[in-house]
């Protein structure tokens, strides 16, 4: 019996919507990253993108435990000397709530072209509204 490997053209991708309200950031991000990779499917193949599309709503209501609200820092660099910027979780969730979930999930995906393709299937929105109703996403309980 030959080992099964999924072909990129035969992979069936579903759409799921996840409500982040009241969810813990890390636990939510690990489940999303796993589903973006396709590890929940029996036809999972490491070198093929077998994952589903994930739409995350209510990103502004995600929570963290402990003192991470004030202590967790996010860093970015402009590329120029001395161009490092830092912002804590509390300020970032007020400024750009989508970036908190996007950053957490992106860090859990492979750092290669396949990982970038997986990351493109993640859609994050601050509020409850999203423009993907035409895809008829199924609700995913995490």
Curated annotation (Swiss-Prot):
PROSITE patterns given for it? RIBOSOMAL_L13
Taken from the UniProt entry, a GO cellular component term is: cytosolic large ribosomal subunit
Keywords of the record = Ribonucleoprotein, Ribosomal protein
Q: Which domain of life is it from?
A: Bacteria
Tell me the PANTHER family matching this sequence: LARGE RIBOSOMAL SUBUNIT PROTEIN UL13M, RIBOSOMAL PROTEIN L13
The family this protein is said to belong to: Belongs to the universal ribosomal protein uL13 family.
> NCBIfam families given for it?
rplM_bact (TIGR01066)
What protein name applies here?
A: Large ribosomal subunit protein uL13
Give the organism, scientific name: Pseudomonas fluorescens (strain ATCC BAA-477 / NRRL B-23932 / Pf-5)
- In the UniProt record, the gene name given for this protein reads rplM
């Amino acid at each position: 019996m030959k080992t099964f490997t999924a072909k990129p053209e035969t992979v069936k991708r579903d759409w799921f919507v996840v409500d982040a309200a009241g969810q813990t950031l890390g636990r939510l991000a690990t489940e999303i990253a796993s589903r973006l990779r396709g590890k929940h499917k029996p036809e999972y193949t490491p070198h093929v993108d077998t994952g589903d599309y994930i739409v995350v709503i209510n990103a502004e209501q995600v929570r963290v435990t402990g003192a991470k609200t004030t202590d967790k820092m996010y860093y970015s660099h402009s590329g120029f000397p001395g161009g490092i910027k830092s912002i804590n979780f509390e300020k970032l969730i007020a400024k750009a709530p989508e970036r908190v979930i996007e950053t957490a999930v992106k860090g859990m995906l492979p750092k290669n072209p396949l990982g970038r393709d997986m990351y493109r299937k993640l859609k994050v929105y601050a509020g409850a509204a999203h423009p993907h109703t035409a895809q008829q996403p199924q609700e995913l309980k995490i």
